[in-house]
Amino acid sequence: MQIKSAEFIKSAAKPVGYPPGDLPEVAFAGRSNVGKSSLINVLVNRRGLVRTSSTPGRTQLLNFFEVNQHFMLVDLPGFGFAKVPVSVKKAWGRMTRTYLEERTNLKAVVLLFDIRREPRDEELQLLDWLEELNIPTIPVITKVDKVTKNRRRAQIRPILEATGLPQEAFSFFSALTREGREDILQRLDVALSDVEDEFGIDVPESE
C-alpha cells in the first residue's frame, strides 16, 4: 500500500459527531502509552500528524484521520491508566464500545501490545470482544527496540500465552527503527481488500 496523503479530520465522543460513514475505517486500540499515535505517524509518513505524549491517557476522544482520500484510521482512547478518574475511564469505555458495536464501515482493529508488559484484563477482554463482534483483528507488538533481539523471544512469550495467539499472528513494530511498517501496511491492504466493490473506491497498491 502506498500512502500518498493523510490528514486529521475531526475528534468525536459520540456517533452524532463521527464523520460520514462513506469510507472504510481501521481503528487502533491498546492500553495508554502503548504507542498508537507513534504507529499511525510512521504508517502514514507524517511525523506529528497524531500528537504523541509521554503522559498516558492523553487521547480522550476518537480521532479520525483520512488517508489517500480513500479510508480512515481511527485512534481510540487508551485504557488502563490508573491515574485517570473512574468517571473518565467509564466514558472512554462507552465511547469505544459504542464505536465498535455501531460503526458499520469498520473493517479491522489494530490491537497493540507493549513488548515490555504482560497483557492486562482489558486487552484480553477487548481481543475476545472483537472476536465476538466478528471484527478482524491485527495484533501488533510495539516498542520492540526497547529490548535486545536476544531477549525478544522471552519478552513475547507471556503475550502469546495470555492471548492464545501464535507468534506468526503478530506484527512487530518499532517507531524508532520503523521495523514492521511494511508488514502492517500489507495487512491493512488485506483488511481493506474488499472496499473497491463495497465503497466504490480504489486503494493504491504498493509499487
Swiss-Prot record:
Pfam families reported in the protein's UniProt record: MMR_HSR1
> What is one cellular component GO term in this UniProt entry?
cytosol
Indicate which residues the UniProt annotation says bind GTP.
30-37, 57-61, 75-78, 142-145, 173-175
Q: Which UniProt keywords apply?
A: Cell cycle, Cell division, GTP-binding, Magnesium, Metal-binding, Nucleotide-binding, Septation
Residues covered by the EngB-type G domain: 22-194
Q: Where does Mg(2+) bind?
A: S37, T59
**Cofactor(s) the protein needs:** Mg(2+)
The record's PANTHER family line, in alphabetical order, gives: ENGB-TYPE G DOMAIN-CONTAINING PROTEIN, MSS1/TRME-RELATED GTP-BINDING PROTEIN
Name the job this protein performs.
Answer: Necessary for normal cell division and for the maintenance of normal septation.
The record's annotation in NCBIfam families points to: GTPase_YsxC (TIGR03598)
Record-stated family:
Belongs to the TRAFAC class TrmE-Era-EngA-EngB-Septin-like GTPase superfamily. EngB GTPase family.
Task: Identify this protein by name.
Answer: Probable GTP-binding protein EngB
Q: Which organism is it from?
A: Syntrophotalea carbinolica (strain DSM 2380 / NBRC 103641 / GraBd1) (Pelobacter carbinolicus)
Name the lineage: Bacteria, Pseudomonadati, Thermodesulfobacteriota, Desulfuromonadia, Desulfuromonadales
